Regions:
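Extreme N-terminal leader/targeting segments of oxidoreductases
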Residues: 1-33
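Beta1/beta-strand and adjacent pyrophosphate-binding region of the FAD-binding site
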Residues: 28-43, 59-61
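Core beta-strand elements of the Rossmann-like FAD/NAD(P) dinucleotide-binding domain
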Residues: 31, 185-193
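Residues in the short beta-alpha loop(s) of Rossmann-like NAD(P)-binding domains
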Residues: 64
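Conserved N-terminal/central alpha/beta ligand/cofactor-binding core
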Residues: 69, 75-160, 164-165
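A conserved short coil-to-beta-strand element within the FAD-binding core of flavoproteins
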Residues: 162-177
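Short beta-strand segments that buttress and anchor functional surface loops
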Residues: 179-183
């Protein structure tokens, strides 16, 4: 019998529960109505991905910039440049953790986490995250991984708008009627039913 390698922690294999994304094309939203996902952190990315793969063409709005623009703004700031309030370590594609160390703080005991980890691997994360007790993508890989997930959302019919803030939600009779979007840099507003 083999003993575990020194310093290596391995997660026991738990069979994943089936995760079926229904094809909802037949039940698509009416007319020009859209499902709006606010934010492109991990929750927003995966919400948009599953909605897009179900055929619902989500509109994803992110108050910050795309990951490449964020990276350029962060490098400029670190070199003594001004803080870009729309493109920085806090806001933008991938969320606040995109430029952290790339460790995934996940509920690894959840049987659904496997689906998330597999999506990360399909998007370019190292395959080892599928069995590591403490999955780690790495700061060097995470920006490309989130870009690849964005491309999957778009290729499945979703739309992504960066530098766009969810400014207001218009309600009528207890139901959402529209959202008000605001350009993060100019303040220009648009109402989306």
């Amino acid at each position: 019998e083999l003993s575990p390698a020194r310093g290596v922690s391995v997660r026991p294999r738990v069979p994943p529960e089936p995760l079926t994304i229904p094809d909802l094309h037949a039940q698509a939203v009416r007319g020009d109505e859209r499902i709006v996902v606010a934010g492109m952190g991990p929750a927003g990315l995966f919400c948009a991905l599953y909605l897009a793969e179900a055929g619902l063409r989500p509109l994803v709005v992110e108050r910050g910039a795309a990951v490449d623009e964020r990276l350029a703004a962060i490098e400029s700031f670190n070199a003594g440049g001004a803080l870009d309030t729309a493109a920085n370590v806090q806001f933008g594609e991938g969320g606040a953790g995109t430029f952290s160390d790339g460790k995934l703080t996940t509920g690894t005991k959840s049987t659904h986490i496997r689906h998330v980890l597999e999506a990360f691997v399909q998007a370019g994360a190292p395959a080892e995250i599928l069995w590591q007790a403490k999955p780690h993508i790495g700061t060097d890989k995470l920006p490309d991984v989130v870009k690849n997930i964005r491309e999957r959302i778009i290729s499945a019919g979703g739309e992504v708008r960066f530098l766009t803030r969810l400014a207001d939600v218009e309600m009528a009779s207890g139901q959402v009627r529209a959202v008000v979007l605001e350009d993060s840099r100019t303040g220009a507003r648009e109402t989306v039913p």
